[in-house]
Amino acid sequence: MAILNHTLGFPRVGLRRELKKAQESYWAGNSTQEELLAVGRELRARHWQQQQQAGVDLVPVGDFAWYDHVLTTSLLLGNVPARHQNADGTIDLDTLFRLGRGRAPTGEPAAAAEMTKWFNTNYHYMVPEFHKGQQFKLGWSQLLDEVDEALALGHKIKPVLLGPVTYLWLGKVKGEPFDRLSLLNDILPVYQQVLAELAKRGVEWVQIDEPALVLELPQAWLNAFKPAYDALQGQVKLLLTTYFDSVGHNLDTLRELPVQGLHVDLVGGHDDIAVLNKALPKEWLLSLGVINGRNVWRADLSNWFERLQPLVGSRPLWIGTSCSLLHSPIDLSVETRLDEEVKSWFAFALQKCGELALLSAALNAPGAAKQAELDAYSAPIRARRQSSRVHNAQVGQRLAAITAQDSERQRPYAERAQAQRERFNLPAWPTTTIGSFPQTTEIRGLRLDFKQGRLDGNNYRTSISEHIKQAIVEQERLGLDVLVHGEAERNDMVEYFGENLDGFVFTQNGWVQSYGSRCVKPPVIIGDISRPEAITVEWAKYAQSLTDKPVKGMLTGPVTILCWSFPREDVTREVIAKQIALALRDEVEDLEKAGIGIIQIDEPALREGLPLRQSDWAAYLNWAVDAFKLNAAVAKDDTQIHTHMCYCEFNDIMDSIAALDADVITIETSRSDMDLLEAFKEFEYPNEIGPGVYDIHSPNVPSVEWIEALLRKAAQNIPAERLWVNPDCGLKTRGWPETRQSLANMVLAAQRLREQQA
């Protein structure tokens, strides 16, 4: 029996981000819906054709989404919140966009659905909303329409459907509390209807995604899989698909299910292939995810051939990507600025399709010629292990020399706080911002001109200096207590540091979707990380020279730089994080020498880096916290270390937040009405806190009374002497008019509280 290969999904946005541009044009009213639909059809046809030409046996259909595939599933099931429903009950493309964005060219604006991370990736999905007694019906035919499209084009296809249990797991209850799992029997008839429609079209296999099976699920949720799949069996063959981690701990549940195949992720997970092969019913197809869908590295096909060949003939086998290629850039061939050595180490989505074809061909017809092909393909991986671009002996030596004391400040917080009060003499309720100020068209144009050689270094620095000066003048005029330089020189909080550290490379077109039309271009960590020279000191020192008030030095923390980059695969994430920490430790020391007394080390991704299974959290948090402390602990007692985190769940990691031992932590709290601070109160968090007093994601200007009320509420949880006053996050995406007005109101609210306290 032949071993087929398949992908679990393909990037949607297009090589030149065509989907993003078409979406934003439509939203702005500059193009019609038919023009947008035409772009979608063209992209789908191109991507199916590209996969087929690369040698993929079964192309996925249903992986395309206008905004997000979980949102697409909500519409498929007719799950549209009342605030977004059309008067006639129909669902259209603008319904989808209102759910995703809060507004669309037609229909009334209303609050968008909540957005959160898709498992442990940097992709975001729109959270389904569930109400007690909710009804479901087949409401959106996108999947069936796209199957018809692909079949008409002559492709061998495998429709992709998010499974019912994972769909419910990913959602949230709204209104009267109830168990959302109780809705399972209500959504199953819609799934049955969809599968029946696919069977009518001659579909043999359906990829039904249940990634929740890699989690440590409550028993009630595990018990739900058997009745769910009992209801879905019999119409088409079901490939139960898991990814991002192992499934071995849920094997007892899995092997009782009436499905015809199982896909496992052998890259993100560490399941023993032999154990799986023995444990699963012999008639089942076993699909092995061997090509990493989440990274950019060339696969070691020789190694995979050795691992997989013993299974050939033992059962029906497929090979595939570990997960959807959604998380990978599209095509390496258009990267013209990467040097050939580094380029030979990479594979993007199209190249990964070629890897599948090469490996499946070798497994189907092994022999000396095929082995030579695999060895030749894998040769750059072996060469990379010896490359001077990868290994820096000094970094290794420095890492090996780390002691426990290197991660500890000289004195405990209480003693440091006294030294810092004496140094800075700040008022009660000190005011500050998180770091960035509005990135105007002029600022972005300056950076682009400099990057493309249209502006020389001297003129660039002069222009950036003027913008920094403007930011300082604005802050002094507003009456802020601790200032920032505004980050005019930075395009992105991770990319800026990656560009100035050895061990990183950057792509021209390595875009991946983050959510909706937003795409990011992560740096790639290719080798040992070091800092050849100071990165931020020049600008921080200049900004400090313009004012008598303290100016914060601004760094992105090691865990965030790691999480928002494509990491190496030949060393652990812990090693990478600590290499970054050592490089930035030198930056802290240099900032101190330049007279900067307050240094902020942002770690918004600390929680995002958590493993999927809670039993694995402790090991991660130990090294993640240690990396932050290694970065910060070189600071003197009277240097105040700030950190910023912008997520909304602290309760289960409060021990680790406290263990960071930052002198001040600023957090995102305005949208939760300060409720997040209860976790800090219950934990008796000992250090200083700046709860965000207004939401920077909205152009709305908060009133003085609103901010004052939030701060009073904050003071019920945290002693006033340990409270700071600041926005939720950086102001990069805002305009100057609302920024000035919002900050003026914030400063006035703090002044009122000081007067009342006096």
From Swiss-Prot:
<dbReference type="InterPro" id="IPR038071">
    <property type="entry name" value="UROD/MetE-like_sf"/>
</dbReference>
<dbReference type="InterPro" id="IPR013215">
    <property type="entry name" value="Cbl-indep_Met_Synth_N"/>
</dbReference>
<feature type="binding site">
    <location>
        <position position="668"/>
    </location>
    <ligand>
        <name>Zn(2+)</name>
    </ligand>
</feature>
<feature type="binding site">
    <location>
        <position position="117"/>
    </location>
    <ligand>
        <name>5-methyltetrahydropteroyltri-L-glutamate</name>
    </ligand>
</feature>
<keyword id="KW-0028">Amino-acid biosynthesis</keyword>
<feature type="binding site">
    <location>
        <position position="646"/>
    </location>
    <ligand>
        <name>Zn(2+)</name>
    </ligand>
</feature>
<keyword id="KW-0489">Methyltransferase</keyword>
<feature type="binding site">
    <location>
        <position position="644"/>
    </location>
    <ligand>
        <name>Zn(2+)</name>
    </ligand>
</feature>
<feature type="binding site">
    <location>
        <begin position="434"/>
        <end position="436"/>
    </location>
    <ligand>
        <name>L-methionine</name>
    </ligand>
</feature>
<dbReference type="InterPro" id="IPR006276">
    <property type="entry name" value="Cobalamin-indep_Met_synthase"/>
</dbReference>
<feature type="binding site">
    <location>
        <position position="487"/>
    </location>
    <ligand>
        <name>L-methionine</name>
    </ligand>
</feature>
<keyword id="KW-0808">Transferase</keyword>
<feature type="binding site">
    <location>
        <begin position="518"/>
        <end position="519"/>
    </location>
    <ligand>
        <name>5-methyltetrahydropteroyltri-L-glutamate</name>
    </ligand>
</feature>
<keyword id="KW-0486">Methionine biosynthesis</keyword>
<dbReference type="GO" id="GO:0003871">
    <property type="term" value="F:5-methyltetrahydropteroyltriglutamate-homocysteine S-methyltransferase activity"/>
</dbReference>
<dbReference type="Pfam" id="PF01717">
    <property type="entry name" value="Meth_synt_2"/>
</dbReference>
<comment type="pathway">
    <text>Amino-acid biosynthesis; L-methionine biosynthesis via de novo pathway; L-methionine from L-homocysteine (MetE route): step 1/1.</text>
</comment>
<dbReference type="Pfam" id="PF08267">
    <property type="entry name" value="Meth_synt_1"/>
</dbReference>
<keyword id="KW-0862">Zinc</keyword>
<dbReference type="GO" id="GO:0009086">
    <property type="term" value="P:methionine biosynthetic process"/>
</dbReference>
<feature type="binding site">
    <location>
        <begin position="434"/>
        <end position="436"/>
    </location>
    <ligand>
        <name>L-homocysteine</name>
    </ligand>
</feature>
<dbReference type="GO" id="GO:0032259">
    <property type="term" value="P:methylation"/>
</dbReference>
<keyword id="KW-0479">Metal-binding</keyword>
<feature type="binding site">
    <location>
        <position position="602"/>
    </location>
    <ligand>
        <name>L-homocysteine</name>
    </ligand>
</feature>
<feature type="binding site">
    <location>
        <position position="608"/>
    </location>
    <ligand>
        <name>5-methyltetrahydropteroyltri-L-glutamate</name>
    </ligand>
</feature>
<feature type="binding site">
    <location>
        <position position="602"/>
    </location>
    <ligand>
        <name>L-methionine</name>
    </ligand>
</feature>
<dbReference type="InterPro" id="IPR002629">
    <property type="entry name" value="Met_Synth_C/arc"/>
</dbReference>
<keyword id="KW-0677">Repeat</keyword>
<feature type="binding site">
    <location>
        <position position="729"/>
    </location>
    <ligand>
        <name>Zn(2+)</name>
    </ligand>
</feature>
<comment type="function">
    <text>Catalyzes the transfer of a methyl group from 5-methyltetrahydrofolate to homocysteine resulting in methionine formation.</text>
</comment>
<feature type="binding site">
    <location>
        <begin position="17"/>
        <end position="20"/>
    </location>
    <ligand>
        <name>5-methyltetrahydropteroyltri-L-glutamate</name>
    </ligand>
</feature>
<feature type="active site" description="Proton donor">
    <location>
        <position position="697"/>
    </location>
</feature>
<dbReference type="GO" id="GO:0008270">
    <property type="term" value="F:zinc ion binding"/>
</dbReference>
<comment type="similarity">
    <text>Belongs to the vitamin-B12 independent methionine synthase family.</text>
</comment>
<feature type="binding site">
    <location>
        <position position="564"/>
    </location>
    <ligand>
        <name>5-methyltetrahydropteroyltri-L-glutamate</name>
    </ligand>
</feature>
<protein>
    <recommendedName>
        <fullName>5-methyltetrahydropteroyltriglutamate--homocysteine methyltransferase</fullName>
        <ecNumber>2.1.1.14</ecNumber>
    </recommendedName>
</protein>
<feature type="binding site">
    <location>
        <position position="487"/>
    </location>
    <ligand>
        <name>L-homocysteine</name>
    </ligand>
</feature>
